[in-house]
Amino acid sequence: MNRKLFILIILFTFFIFFQISYAVDYSDVFITYKGKDLGQFTLKNSIFEKDKIIVQENDSYILSPVIKLPFCFEECVPSWNVKCSDESSFCVFVRFGKSDSENKLSPWLLMGEWGEMSNYKTLKSYLDKSQIEGKFENPFKYSGISIETDYILSKDKKFDLIQFCFIFNPNYVVEFSSLNISASTQRGDKKLKLYERTNLGKNSYVVVPFRSQGWEDKKISSEICSVVSTATVMDYYGVDIKTAELAKVAYDKRYKMYGMWWRAVQSAHQYGFDGYVRHFRSFEDVKEYIDKKMPVIACICVNKNDIADDPQYETDGHVLVILGFDENGDILCADGGFRKEEDGILSYKREEFEKIWFVNGGGIGYIIMPANKK
């Protein structure tokens, strides 16, 4: 065999092997339970009716099946759509297991609360009273796994089973519409070479009514980027809610913050919207939504020198709305951190946005849409 040809074959084989290894270095999965899928849930003092679960009595619970993920995850981001009155409340618990250990599950951890905040003793009494199998010990940590405000982190990547439990104290009827789970084998995405620049279409975007974080309540203006982004998308679909009003709904009393991911989705659901949080790994993923005229809410993190035009800008967390792609194929956004629309509707170079969203921000985004929109 010709020596040069032999070397080329070896190099080509190595290249293919490297690309395959590179591409499968992490995995993502998005799982949703809604409609008839909710018939798989175990219920107490609740009924499955017309593709929803109706909760009508106190001491009710909804228990998901034990969900088998296709891998042991590092990061899991859940969200849900539960419609309830101002007087109703519920707690969300989660536990984990490994499929090769006789499906033994961990104690329950506290994922979140809606409505009146409870102390840990009361939370434990909810589980005890419901007679759900399982313990409630440390509310936020267990054997290498922890609840990190609005997502689940498993540094050891040793769990591939997950189960959720919703315990309710409804004063009025509560409707449970969906449970959504986005899981990944890694938190950030440092493999930008996976995403070669493709033709995403130029001048392909939606137009939203701009709103600023600083237009209403100045006391919280620096804390409500998630709320403003959610309100912007709701306004785009025709529901104009004051930002300050939505902020009251989205505020988490335990963590004392407005920007929790699942709470953004849950808040919008109170006004007739469905939604979920998920991992995005490429702008091809985004294009699927833009083609349907659906804006995408993105959670970014910016280090100094990440943005060439503003090298001193940095933030450990900011939320804005992706509108689509400008005339250069770069990323067109609505950023409520600006006071004026002419400043807040802006484009990011694709490579820079890849870094601040996919790499630094882990590709976390949420979709808000009118109920029953596909």
Residue locations for each model-derived region?
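A short beta-strand element within beta-rich, extracytoplasmic domains
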Residues: C72-C84
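Bacterial N-terminal signal peptides
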Residues: L8-F17
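Glycan-recognition and processing domains
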Residues: I20-D59
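Extracellular carbohydrate recognition and processing domains
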Residues: L105-K157
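Active-site-adjacent structural segments surrounding the nucleophilic cysteine of cysteine proteases
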Residues: I20-A23, F30-T32, F159-L161, C165-M257
